[in-house]
């Protein structure tokens, strides 16, 4: 076996050194930029301008249609922490703050329901330390949301929280905490937050099928239809449709989330931004895009039906004769076709 020469070893070492130096420089530049941005944001004049700009943009968007149900796949917390050389816990905490900020915005825009993919059933396969960290953070955020939902001075006042998923996988203490928070916020009717924890779409549909079959056998109920099936899902009525699903961190997949809810004309947006960095303007542009195309679609549907009514009311003598032949007027295709290779 041929041993690598000293020059090759030095070249590999130099290459690694250059890569590490590049990463350190990128990290330093990002840190400086973040500090400068944080300093600018702390200026009272800039903060005043930013808040008023948000208010103007929100009022402008409320003029048109807004989605009733917006959902988030909150991906990128761990990479966010790793990029800043922070513990994984800090990344998840930053993600919690991002969700809270966007909930404020959605409620002000007039969105009735927000759902968030907080914990997949598959996440139980992660290291125990990280799972315990997520459970503890989830408990803290539950208490925080319950307090905000009952504080009339808080923007989330009058909100309702529902934890959906396979709660049999959670500890008795966690199930007790969830039940308490849901009871505290059950009177909220302005805004609903669904936290999917722990959740997968396959589990959601499996649970619904079991409940539907048991109900049919016990109560001799009529045939199971789509409406009844949908209402038995974890999110109940809100399982009917999700208008806008947003996933961050650059991955182009749904990760077994909201497969039933997005099957009917939903808009799915993918962002390369990590979840803790997902900002007001990023979400605003996505909702603005949804509102724009939703308005065009409704306009086209309305004018198309109006054109059909006008066309039907016009006497046949004034209607333009069709010169193109319809496909339905062609004879039936042959039963079989054989092709030879002869010249």
Curated annotation (Swiss-Prot):
Its cofactor is Mg(2+). Pathway: Protein modification; protein glycosylation. It holds the Pfam family Prenyltransf. It catalyses: n isopentenyl diphosphate + (2E,6E)-farnesyl diphosphate = a di-trans,poly-cis-polyprenyl diphosphate + n diphosphate. GO terms for molecular function: ditrans,polycis-polyprenyl diphosphate synthase [(2E,6E)-farnesyl diphosphate specific] activity; prenyltransferase activity. Coiled coil: none annotated. It is an enzyme of class 2 (transferase). Keywords: Lipid droplet, Magnesium, Transferase. One of its GO terms (cellular component) is membrane. It is found in: Lipid droplet. Gene3D superfamilies: Decaprenyl diphosphate synthase-like. Its main location: other. InterPro entries: UPP_synth-like, UPP_synth-like_CS, UPP_synth-like_sf. GO terms for biological process: dolichol biosynthetic process; protein glycosylation. The keyword Transferase applies. Forms an active dehydrodolichyl diphosphate synthase complex with NUS1. Belongs to the UPP synthase family. With NUS1, forms the dehydrodolichyl diphosphate synthase (DDS) complex, an essential component of the dolichol monophosphate (Dol-P) biosynthetic machinery. Adds multiple copies of isopentenyl pyrophosphate (IPP) to farnesyl pyrophosphate (FPP) to produce dehydrodolichyl diphosphate (Dedol-PP), a precursor of dolichol which is utilized as a sugar carrier in protein glycosylation in the endoplasmic reticulum (ER). This is Dehydrodolichyl diphosphate synthase complex subunit SRT1. The gene is SRT1.
């Amino acid at each position: 076996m041929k041993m690598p020469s000293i020059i090759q070893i030095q070249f590999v070492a130099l290459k690694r050194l250059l890569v590490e130096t590049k990463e350190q420089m990128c990290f330093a530049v990002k840190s400086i930029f973040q500090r400068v941005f944080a300093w600018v944001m702390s200026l009272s004049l800039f903060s005043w301008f930013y808040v008023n700009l948000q208010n103007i943009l929100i009022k402008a968007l409320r003029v048109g249609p807004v989605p009733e149900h917006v959902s988030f796949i909150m991906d990128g917390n761990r990479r966010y922490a790793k990029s800043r050389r922070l513990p994984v816990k800090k990344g998840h905490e930053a993600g919690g703050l991002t969700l809270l900020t966007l909930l404020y915005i959605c409620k002000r825009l007039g969105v009735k329901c927000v759902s968030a993919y907080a914990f997949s059933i598959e996440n139980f396969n992660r290291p125990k330390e990280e799972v315990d960290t997520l459970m503890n953070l989830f408990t803290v955020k539950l208490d925080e949301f319950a307090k905000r939902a009952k504080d009339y001075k808080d923007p989330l006042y009058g909100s309702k929280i529902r934890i959906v998923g396979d709660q049999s996988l959670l500890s008795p203490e966690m199930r007790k905490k969830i039940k308490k928070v849901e009871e505290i916020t059950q009177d909220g009717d302005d805004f609903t937050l669904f936290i999917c924890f722990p959740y997968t779409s396959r589990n959601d549909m499996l649970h619904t099928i079991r409940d539907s079959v048991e109900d049919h056998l016990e109560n001799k109920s009529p045939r199971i239809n789509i409406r009844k099936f949908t209402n038995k899902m974890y999110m109940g009525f809100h399982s009917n449709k999700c208008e806008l699903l947003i996933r961050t961190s650059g991955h182009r997949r749904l990760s077994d989330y909201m497969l039933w809810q997005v099957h009917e004309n939903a808009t799915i947006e993918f962002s390369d931004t990590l979840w803790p960095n997902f900002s007001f303007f990023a979400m605003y542009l996505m909702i603005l895009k949804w509102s724009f195309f939703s308005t065009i679609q409704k306009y086209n549907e309305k004018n198309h039906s109006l054109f059909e009514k006008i066309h039907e009311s016009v006497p046949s003598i004034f209607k333009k004769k069709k010169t193109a032949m319809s496909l339905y007027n062609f004879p039936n295709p042959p039963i079989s076709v054989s092709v030879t290779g002869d010249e």
